[in-house]
UniProtKB/Swiss-Prot annotation:
Function: Binds directly to 23S rRNA. The L1 stalk is quite mobile in the ribosome, and is involved in E site tRNA release. Protein L1 is also a translational repressor protein, it controls the translation of the L11 operon by binding to its mRNA.
Identification of the protein by name: Large ribosomal subunit protein uL1
Primary gene name: rplA
HAMAP family (UniProt xref): Ribosomal_uL1_B
Record note on quaternary structure: Part of the 50S ribosomal subunit. Interacts with RNA helicase CshA. Interacts with VmlR. In stalled ribosomes contacts MutS2.
Keywords: Repressor, Ribonucleoprotein, Ribosomal protein, RNA-binding, rRNA-binding, Translation regulation, tRNA-binding
GO biological process: regulation of translation; translation
Family designation: Belongs to the universal ribosomal protein uL1 family.
NCBIfam families: rplA_bact (TIGR01169)
Single Gene Ontology MF annotation: tRNA binding
Length: 232
C-alpha cells in the first residue's frame, strides 16, 4: 500500500472517521482537506446493498447534474447523413463513422464520451473490446445509443454523468470541482443521491444505501449522514 504524503496525513486529522457529517458540513470539509494544487474533482461514493453478479441487481444509468461537473466533455458521435449534420450543429467535437473506428483501433482516445445512432452500432461493436474496459461503449441505458443526437449531446455538455455499480457494489461519480460554491456541490450531491435511490432494484434486499462518502481527488473521504437533508 502506497504511503500517504505529509499534507494528506495532516488533512486526514481534520476528519473524524467515526462520524457521519451533515452534507453541507461534509462538502465544506472536503474542500478544506483538499491537498491538490489543481482544481480537484469532488466525487461521491456509494456502497450499496446489492449483488452485482445477479442481472436483476445491476444498476446503470445517467443523470444531468444541475450545476455540471466543471469538466468540458469531448463528444465523439458515430452517425451518417442528416444525423451527422445534426451532431455537428449540436456541438459534437468529432463526428464520423468508420474513419474514427479505424483511428480508435490505432490507439486514438482524445474524447470522453461516445454517442452512436442505433444503425451504427454494428460498426461500433467491432471495437467493443477496446471501448468496454475503458467505460466508453455507448449504451441505450445511458442515452448514448439514440437517434436523438442533438438531445444527447446537449445533456452531456450540460453536465450529464454516467453511473454504474462495480463488482463490489460501489458507485463512484464526480459531482463537481473544489472551486464550486458549497451550495452547488450540495445540490449536485442531492440530485445524485436521489437518482441512486430511484434506481434501487426490486430484487435488492435489506439495507440499500449502506454508506455514502464524498472526497476530492487527493483528499481523505468524508462520510455523509444522508438523513440530514431532504431527498425529493
Amino acid at each position: 500500500m502506497a504511503k500517504k504524503g505529509k499534507k494528506y496525513v495532516e488533512a486526514a486529522k481534520l476528519v473524524d472517521r467515526s462520524k457521519a457529517y451533515d452534507v453541507s458540513e461534509a462538502v465544506a470539509l472536503v474542500k478544506k482537506t483538499n491537498t491538490a494544487k489543481f482544481d480537484a474533482t469532488v466525487e461521491v461514493a456509494f456502497r450499496l446493498g446489492v449483488d452485482p453478479r445477479k442481472n436483476d441487481q445491476q444498476i446503470r444509468g445517467a443523470v444531468v447534474l444541475p450545476n455540471g461537473t466543471g469538466k468540458t466533455q469531448r463528444v465523439l458521435v458515430f452517425a451518417k447523413g442528416e444525423k451527422a449534420k445534426e451532431a455537428e450543429a449540436a456541438g459534437a467535437d468529432f463526428v464520423g463513422d468508420t474513419d474514427y473506428i479505424n483511428k480508435i483501433q490505432q490507439g486514438w482516445f482524445d474524447f470522453d464520451v461516445i454517442v452512436a445512432t442505433p444503425d451504427m452500432m454494428g460498426e461500433v461493436g467491432k471495437i467493443g473490446r477496446v471501448l468496454g474496459p475503458k467505460g466508453l461503449m455507448p449504451n441505450p441505458k445511458t442515452g448514448t445509443v439514440t437517434f436523438e443526437v442533438e438531445k444527447a449531446i446537449g445533456e452531456i455538455k450540460a453536465g450529464k454523468v454516467e453511473y454504474r455499480v462495480d463488482k463490489a457494489g460501489n458507485i463512484h461519480v464526480p459531482i463537481g470541482k473544489v472551486s464550486f460554491e458549497d451550495e452547488k456541490l450540495v445540490e449536485n450531491f442531492t440530485t445524485m443521491y436521489d437518482t441512486i435511490l430511484k434506481a434501487k432494484p426490486a430484487a435488492a434486499k435489506g439495507v440499500y444505501v449502506k454508506n455514502v462518502a464524498v472526497t476530492s481527488t487527493m483528499g481523505p473521504g468524508v462520510k455523509v449522514d444522508s438523513s440530514t437533508f431532504n431527498v425529493k
